[in-house]
Each structure stands twice: as structure tokens, then as C-alpha cells.
């Protein structure tokens, strides 16, 4: 949301803060009773839930100790550093009770009563059951405590005022007062701990999920997460459930390779899930119909297509083949690819400008790389080749302009590589 719009709401927000000041403490007082002492089975269950929630993906920083936090999370409103969730008493959650943990997971409230920023995806985690919360808590109590205090968040005024989250919650958060593990295991994972919509659902100006647009694809920090609906061109409509499960488990299938932020998800989370879990996710995603099928795009300029084809033959065909079919499971095919035909070309442009590397998993231990072409191709050339691959071999997608490329090039060059987060 533009800052002037947010400032115009300051009076309302201040009132919301005043109203919120008492209920915060009441939430902590009225929380359910503390969980009983953990046993080995509960800890093991919690460890598996931490995998489902991709906790390492945000709470591990490069070169840091496991779950000690400090990873910078890019949001549209500034940078937030992930928390230390080890049981260290001074810098982690070592003094938290099971009730404190439940309040954080379920309501977005810290042990001291302050609101959590929804970069921590409590709007999804609220669907976790109390038994799941207690198991996660039991597991985190067993990890090695690390004395490490993450850097202070870098949020400009007024986004650095935590009580503004109260207003955000009014618009975007509904606590699940009776969470269950149903109706299907896949739905519980996707809508709950898996928090797939945090990236794959389009966002409002304030960073909340757009209502009625679940899993239709979302833009975040110079990436576009494609739709997970039944959209045939820009979603998973052409993917059998087995292909979805294979992609989540191994990072590759005959249609796509995981890299970028999704590569992190596969590395830390889905590749470590049980086969039954990835199969359940796949089965649920196949029930998501395309509420808004991607419309056909106008035919691109033939001159631009000719320029793009020449660049493609010179620079891309060696790996992706002249017909775009490449070598499936090694170099992803381009015909019919959702990421290629998405309404937003950001990820395709990001691959061309920055290059990418596929994730390494136990099933596919050798990562494969695509080089950066930012040094070699100017904005018009990148736009031309992107337009070409988005509109060849049966693909249809809007043409890309040199201006779009220039804008993304500046953003990518200006920011260090950090973990993206769709909301604050």
C-alpha cells in the first residue's frame, strides 16, 4: 500500500492499538493449559511437522546454526530478520511455555504479548491443531540452544510500529477457533503448516491474500510463483498428480526443475516429507479448479519474435533444443511450461538475467545450472527472447517490453540475494 494511504489511516490505527492493548494480555492469560512432558514419539512427530512447515527455510541463515534465525526476509515494506527459535533462554524461545508457543503459532502473538509480523505465516499456521503445536514445541525444546540475537528489522516508519499489525489482522487474519486435520491430509498441509498460499496466492496492497484468489499465483521479491490451480497453461492443469509428487520429492520431473525460492522449499521441506505426504499434497492440488483460466494473449510483433528466435538459437538452443523440448529431468522443456506462460513474466526474466541452479536432493544429487545473460543481452534483447519462448511451440503469453526488463534488472542488481516473503 502506498505510504500516503497508510498515513491517512493513522487515526483508525491508533484507535485499533488502544483497543488491542488489553486483549493481547488476555490472550496469553486465557491460553489453553501447558502441554504434558514430551515423549520420544511426540518429539519425532514434531520433527516431521517442522519439515512440513519448512521451518529451516526461514530460520536457518547461511553459515549460521540450525534454527538460530537471522535470515533476512524481503517484504514489500522492508527487511525482517527471522527469529531464533532454539531453546536458548536469552536469545531464543527457551523461556517460552507450550501456551506461549501455541499463541505465536495460532494467533501471531509473542510470549511478551506483542504482535508478530505476518512474515511469520500465522494466518496459515492458525489451522494447526493444538496437538501439532505441542509436538512442534516439544521438538524445538530438543534442538541445540544457540546464543545468537538476529539483527534489528529494517522497516521504515510507520511499518516499524508493531501495533499496526492489529489493523492488518482485522483485514487479513481470521483465527481458526477449532482446527482439525481434515477434511483431507493434503488440504490440511497446503492450507496449514505448508503455507503454500504465502507465495502462490496473489496479494493485496497491504500484503494480505486476495480473497477468492487462492493459489492463483503471486509475485514476491522479484519472483513470480506460478498458479497451483487447474489452469492448463499457467497452472497445474496438465500435470498428473504423480508428476506433482515427483517434483516435490525430487525437485524435478519431466516438466520442470525446482530452483530459486521453490528450490529452497524442496531442499528444506518437501524432499524430506514422507511419500504419503507429498502424494496427499498432489491429490489436493489436483482438486483446485481454475477459477480464472489464463486468457489467450494477443499475437506478438513478428519482428520481435524474429529477433527473439535468433537470440534463442544462439544462446538457448544448446540446452533447451531448437524445438524447446530440451532433455526432460535435466533441462526443462519450454512448450507448455507454466512458468513460461504465466501472466507475469518476472520469473522467466529473472532466469535470463540472473541465471539459476536446480536444487540437489537425495534422488537428484547433481544440481544443474543456467548461466546469467545480464552481461551479454541488453533490455530489448532479453525482452525479445522472453517474448519468443512465451509465444512459441504452442505457448501463449503477453509480450514482454524492454521497460519491464530494465525495471527488474535494476531491482535485482540493487538487492542482495535474500529469502523473499510476501507479507510483513
Regions found by a protein language model. Name each.
Residues 1-12, 18-22:
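Bacterial N-terminal signal peptides that target proteins for export
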Residues 241, 248, 335-384:
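Extended, polar beta-sheet/loop recognition surfaces of beta-rich domains
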Residues 107-110, 250-254, 354:
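Glycine-rich, acidic and aromatic/proline-enriched surface loops and short helix-turn segments
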Residues 18-33:
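Signal peptide processing junction and immediate N-terminal pro/mature segment
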Residues 93-109, 113, 135, 237-241:
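Aromatic- and charge-enriched surface segment that lines or borders ligand/interaction sites
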Residues 30-35, 39-41, 52, 60-80, ...:
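Flexible coil segments in periplasmic/lumen-exposed cytochrome c-class electron-transfer proteins
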Residues 309-350, 366:
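C-terminal structural cap/anchor segments
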Residues 79-87, 223-229:
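Acidic/histidine-rich, surface-exposed loop or edge segments in extracytoplasmic proteins
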Amino acid at each position: 500500500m502506498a505510504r500516503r494511504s497508510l498515513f491517512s489511516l493513522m487515526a483508525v490505527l491508533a484507535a485499533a492499538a488502544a483497543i488491542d492493548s488489553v486483549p493481547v494480555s488476555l490472550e496469553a492469560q486465557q491460553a489453553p493449559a501447558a502441554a504434558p512432558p514430551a515423549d520420544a514419539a511426540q518429539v519425532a512427530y514434531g520433527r516431521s511437522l517442522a519439515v512440513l512447515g519448512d521451518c529451516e527455510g526461514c530460520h536457518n541463515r547461511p553459515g549460521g546454526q540450525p534454527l538460530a534465525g537471522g535470515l533476512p526476509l524481503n517484504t514489500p515494506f522492508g527487511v525482517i530478520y527471522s527469529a531464533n527459535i532454539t531453546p536458548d533462554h536469552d536469545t531464543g524461545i527457551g523461556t517460552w511455555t507450550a501456551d506461549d508457543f501455541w499463541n505465536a503459532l495460532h494467533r501471531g502473538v509473542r510470549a511478551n504479548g506483542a504482535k508478530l509480523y505476518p512474515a511469520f505465516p500465522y494466518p496459515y499456521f492458525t489451522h494447526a491443531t493444538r496437538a501439532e503445536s505441542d509436538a512442534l514445541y516439544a521438538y524445538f525444546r530438543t534442538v541445540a540452544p544457540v546464543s545468537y540475537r538476529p539483527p534489528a528489522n529494517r522497516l521504515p516508519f510507520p511499518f516499524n510500529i508493531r501495533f499496526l499489525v492489529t489493523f492488518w489482522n482485522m483485514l487479513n487474519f481470521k483465527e481458526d477457533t477449532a482446527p482439525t486435520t481434515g477434511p483431507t491430509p493434503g488440504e490440511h498441509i497446503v492450507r496449514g503448516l505448508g503455507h503454500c498460499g504465502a507465495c502462490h496466492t496473489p496479494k493485496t496492497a497491504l500484503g494480505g491474500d486476495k480473497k477468492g484468489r487462492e493459489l492463483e499465483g503471486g509475485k514476491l521479491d522479484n519472483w513470480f510463483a506460478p498458479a497451483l490451480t487447474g489452469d492448463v497453461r499457467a497452472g497445474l492443469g496438465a500435470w498428473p498428480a504423480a508428476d506433482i509428487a515427483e517434483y516435490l520429492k525430487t525437485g524435478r520431473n519431466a516438466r520442470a526443475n525446482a530452483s530459486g525460492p521453490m528450490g529452497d522449499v524442496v531442499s528444506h521441506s518437501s524432499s524430506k516429507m514422507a511419500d504419503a505426504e507429498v502424494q496427499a499434497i498432489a491429490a489436493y492440488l489436483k482438486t483446485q479448479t481454475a477459477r480464472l483460466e489464463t486468457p489467450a494473449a494477443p499475437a506478438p510483433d513478428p519482428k520481435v519474435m524474429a529477433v527473439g528466435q535468433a537470440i534463442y538459437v544462439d544462446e538457448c538452443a544448446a540446452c533447451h533444443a531448437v524445438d524447446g523440448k530440451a532433455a526432460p529431468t535435466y533441462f526443462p522443456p519450454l512448450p507448455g511450461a507454466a512458468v513460461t506462460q504465466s501472466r507475469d513474466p518476472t520469473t522467466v526474466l529473472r532466469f535470463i538475467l540472473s541465471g539459476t541452479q536446480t536444487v540437489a536432493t537425495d534422488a537428484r544429487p547433481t544440481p544443474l545450472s543456467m548461466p546469467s545473460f545480464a552481461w551479454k543481452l541488453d533490455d530489448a534483447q532479453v525482452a525479445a527472447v522472453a517474448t519468443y519462448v512465451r509465444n512459441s511451440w504452442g505457448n501463449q503469453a503477453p509480450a514482454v517490453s524492454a521497460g519491464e526488463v530494465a525495471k527488474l534488472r535494476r531491482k535485482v542488481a540493487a538487492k542482495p540475494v535474500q529469502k523473499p516473503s510476501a507479507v510483513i
